[in-house]
């Protein structure tokens, strides 16, 4: 292949990877794979400088602003850093800048694997925040940055203007928690903490960002009015004084040998840190000499990023173990030929879902490339098809649940396969906890500790077994005397008379919450009728969408679920909802807001009284609110209602409106 063609091919491939990495937050190759492409391109351009162009990945920072956010033009370009892949590269860097710099002392910092940001403060107050983007134009993420608690909205000391650069990252434990949550919901997981941080920071709704424990470190002053500094070490202390989050894991290094020692130390300690790092950043300490050295179009000449060697190992995929999660999700786990990786011996790895298995073309018997996502979770990066013998076997999703043999289902728009059997042994405890919860069958005294004992002692193997329990059996449980047992049996019996909407909620049908269960039970008054209805019938009901309808059809098509419902009926559990006559829809078209504590009604009871009469309960006050029902300690909702001159009712007035006084 001609040199010019190979250079063009490398640029196009890297631009594709830049798009997937920076814009979609879904990398197609590992960082080390990308670095190899960059090294090859750099080498070719050095040998054939006539082919260097202004838009080559070696000449600019990768990435561009997403169209979802307002673009922000950086007052000072946010450049990238040149990479060093060996200690020899660092020594060469030291020699190169030694030709200009008179004092070769450095600041060594950890290279956080996150998202670069620029923060601007005016008169000590956070004005705006932007991502790096292409180095010249980034994305305005101010609203989301404000949700990160480590970033101060006001500095300890006021300066006319301060612009700093930093990195937003996701701690390892939050990365694990978030991916577990996404797996339980049947959603695609994040590949690594960097992508999780990017995906969380670039949410259109700041509340989503706030729900994810992002953190940040600030490491450079880009511009400052009202203060002059001489060294990076001094800048670090000054940023700390201002209350900005600086990483304590930094070191002033008198020479390049001290830098090498710092790098060696953290190559060993990196797995002990609560966040992911992929190298060490080395910066000339003297700021005036940085000015003399200057920068290329892509990177400063006075700094370099040493990248740790990729911790990846090859091993063989021996088989796949299929497990059922607590919410019924079918989860594949890779069984591997044991291999030592990043401090531990690895013999198993999460495969997340069958879509990823297909995308990566993983087969039983394959040689695969393994790494640890977030330095913690073993994960297969890719298969190595060039090493196949032809005897490898394709991995396919199971048709039946491995725990209970029920048919598995998959919903539109989800990557997960699920077991729909509510009595599946793998998900029984969670099903029971939800069934007994306040918003469902509301069985007082039946908490997780009691359920744990009931299931572990085989006293409850299915949901309907709850209604077969005897007082003397419960008395034998730990911390359950005769009085507690009698109260629990009473609560179980009382739950039999709950309305159909509560039972539909309690069954834990995917996408069917308390509100949609109430809507369904207003239109369909007998649980038996759900057996006959298809998606088209259900979507004709107002507010019931295709996902809800599909979920209902799948649930009632499962024979084991039908059996449970029939047994619940036989045991005296109500499965009907009385049809409400048109005349009884007293509150049709009326919107209520509840605030404060009512003397005798819980908020849930008041809500049910409103909804059963055709009214709607809202969580916020507006001009469209018909009534505000206020109890003790009502808070700001009452203030707003008074401001808007809305009708305000106490409990007595509310009951009178309903004809229950």
Curated annotation (Swiss-Prot):
GO terms for biological process: DNA repair; DNA replication. Coiled coil: none annotated. It catalyses: NAD(+) + (deoxyribonucleotide)n-3'-hydroxyl + 5'-phospho-(deoxyribonucleotide)m = (deoxyribonucleotide)n+m + AMP + beta-nicotinamide D-nucleotide. This is DNA ligase. The active site is at 111 (n6-amp-lysine intermediate). PROSITE patterns: BRCT (PS50172), DNA_LIGASE_N1 (PS01055). It comes from Syntrophomonas wolfei subsp. wolfei (strain DSM 2245B / Goettingen). Zn(2+) binds at residues 401, 404, 419, 424.
């Amino acid at each position: 292949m001609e040199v010019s063609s190979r250079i063009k091919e490398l640029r196009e491939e890297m631009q594709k990877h830049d798009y997937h990495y920076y814009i979609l937050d879904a990398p197609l190759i590992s960082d080390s794979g990308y670095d190899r492409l960059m090294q090859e391109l750099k080498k070719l351009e050095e040998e054939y400088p006539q082919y260097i162009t202004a838009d080559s990945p070696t000449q600019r920072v990768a990435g561009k602003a997403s169209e979802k956010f307002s673009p922000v033009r950086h007052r000072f370009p946010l450049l990238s850093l040149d990479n060093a892949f060996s200690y020899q590269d660092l020594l060469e860097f030291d020699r190169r800048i030694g030709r200009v710099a008179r004092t070769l002392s450095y600041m060594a910092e950890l290279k956080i694997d996150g998202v670069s940001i620029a923060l601007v403060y005016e008169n000590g107050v956070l004005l705006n925040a932007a991502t790096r983007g292409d180095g010249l134009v980034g994305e305005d993420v101010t609203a989301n940055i404000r949700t990160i608690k480590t970033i101060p909205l006001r500095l300890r000391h006021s300066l006319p203007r301060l612009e700093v650069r930093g990195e937003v990252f996701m701690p390892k434990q939050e990365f694990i928690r978030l991916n577990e949550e996404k797996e339980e919901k049947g959603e695609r997981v994040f590949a690594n903490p960097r992508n999780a941080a990017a995906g969380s920071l670039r949410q259109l709704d700041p509340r989503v960002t706030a729900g994810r424990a992002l953190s940040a470190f600030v490491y450079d002053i880009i511009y400052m009015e009202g203060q002059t500094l001489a060294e990076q070490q001094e800048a670090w202390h000054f940023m700390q004084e201002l209350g900005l989050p600086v990483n304590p894991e930094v070191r002033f290094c008198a020479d390049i040998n001290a830098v090498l020692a710092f790098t060696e130390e953290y190559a060993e300690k990196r797995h002990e840190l609560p966040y992911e790092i992929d190298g060490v950043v080395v910066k000339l300490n003297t700021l005036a000499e940085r000015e003399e050295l200057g920068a290329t179009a892509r990177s400063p000449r006075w700094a370099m990023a040493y990248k740790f060697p990729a911790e990846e190992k090859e091993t063989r995929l021996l088989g796949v173990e299929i497990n059922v999660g607590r919410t019924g999700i079918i989860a594949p786990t890779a069984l591997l030929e044991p291999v030592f990786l990043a401090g531990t011996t690895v013999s198993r790895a999460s495969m997340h879902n069958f879509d990823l298995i297909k995308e990566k073309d993983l087969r039983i018997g394959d040689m695969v490339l393994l790494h640890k996502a977030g330095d913690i979770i073993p994960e297969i990066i890719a298969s190595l098809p060039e090493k196949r013998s032809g005897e490898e076997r394709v991995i396919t999703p199971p048709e039946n649940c491995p725990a209970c043999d029920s048919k598995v289902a998959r919903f539109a728009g989800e990557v997960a396969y699920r077991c729909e059997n509510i009595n599946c042994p793998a998900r029984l405890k969670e099903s029971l906890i939800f069934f007994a919860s306040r918003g469902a069958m509301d069985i007082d005294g039946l908490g997780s500790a009691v359920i744990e004992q009931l299931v572990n002692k085989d006293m409850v193997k299915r949901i309907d077994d709850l209604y077969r329990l005897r007082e003397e059996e419960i008395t034998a449980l730990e911390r359950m005397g005769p009085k507690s047992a009698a109260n629990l049996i009473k609560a179980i019996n009382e739950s039999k008379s709950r309305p159909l909407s509560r039972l539909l909620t309690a069954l834990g049908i995917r996408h069917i919450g308390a509100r949609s269960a109430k809507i369904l039970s207003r239109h369909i008054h007998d649980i038996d009728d759900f057996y006959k209805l298809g998606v088209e019938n259900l979507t004709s009901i107002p507010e019931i969408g295709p996902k809800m309808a599909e979920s209902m059809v799948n649930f009632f098509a499962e024979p084991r679920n039908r059996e449970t419902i029939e047994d619940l009926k036989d045991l005296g559990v109500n499965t009907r909802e009385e049809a409400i006559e048109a005349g009884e829809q007293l509150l049709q078209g009326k919107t209520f807001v509840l605030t404060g504590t009512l003397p005798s009604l819980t908020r849930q009871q008041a809500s049910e009284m409103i909804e059963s009469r055709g009214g709607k309960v809202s969580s916020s006050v507006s001009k469209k609110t018909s009534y505000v029902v206020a109890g003790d300690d009502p808070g700001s909702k009452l203030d707003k209602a008074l401001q808007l001159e809305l009708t305000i009712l106490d409990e007595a007035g509310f009951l009178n409106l309903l004809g229950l006084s």
